Amino acid sequence: MASLGVNIDHIANVREARKTFEPDPVKMVLLAELGGADGITVHLREDRRHIQDRDLNLLKETVHTRLNLEMAATEEMTSIALNLKPDMVTLVPEKREEVTTEGGLDVIKNKNKLKEIIQRLSGEDIPVSLFVDPVQAQLENCAEVKAAWIELHTGKYAITKNKARDLELSILKENTAKAKSYGLRVNAGHGLTYQNVEPIAAIEGIEELNIGHTIISRALSVGLSQAVKEMKSLIINPRKDNFLL
């Protein structure tokens, strides 16, 4: 059974829209954990468009589950992670002009850089995950740079329908198995919703799903704890063929 990591970036987005003090994502974490979140995920972007350094420091002290820090593979972010010591670092690609992360890391192209960052973080007992597209060549290189984890990008699956979605689901299943055979542990996320999460949650070998936007959206209607609880129930008892379109 996969666990649930709740991404709280969109709470910070609302706060930063007015450059004020609320809603405070740090205060919302308790509600997410009460709803059943197994971990909390935040992305500290280089432009600080939502999560701020202040948030990270407070989250490190207040998260009772696990803190997963998503970040770009830069010297600035590596130094922050080494000082913070989150429970996990997930390295992601980052472009200032994008609304959200648009694709996986090119591990092949950035192999030496990623290997060096992974060595530094792992040396301080910080597990590192690489956010990658479900492509065999990328997975092979994830293993070669000594990443402990990967997070499979589910964005293409999330935006397709019918036979195209079935194909993307098969690709995710196949590459989860390949990643496991390379000694990698597997998470997944991006674009997952209450309507499409169950087939992904049912994939054998996926350990955690990182989900944010759909949970925060649902929370506007039912509250954050209930929104998390509803998502968790879908992940715990997934139906492999359940697509609610």
From Swiss-Prot:
It is found in: Cytoplasm. Its main location: cytoplasm. Gene3D superfamilies: Aldolase class I (3.20.20.70). GO terms for molecular function: pyridoxine 5'-phosphate synthase activity. GO terms for cellular component: cytosol. Keywords: Cytoplasm, Pyridoxine biosynthesis, Transferase. The keyword Cytoplasm applies. The record marks 151 as: Transition state stabilizer. Its EC number is 2.6.99.2. 1-deoxy-D-xylulose 5-phosphate binds at residues 9-10, 45, 50, 100. It catalyses: 3-amino-2-oxopropyl phosphate + 1-deoxy-D-xylulose 5-phosphate = pyridoxine 5'-phosphate + phosphate + 2 H2O + H(+). Homooctamer; tetramer of dimers. This is Pyridoxine 5'-phosphate synthase. The gene is pdxJ.
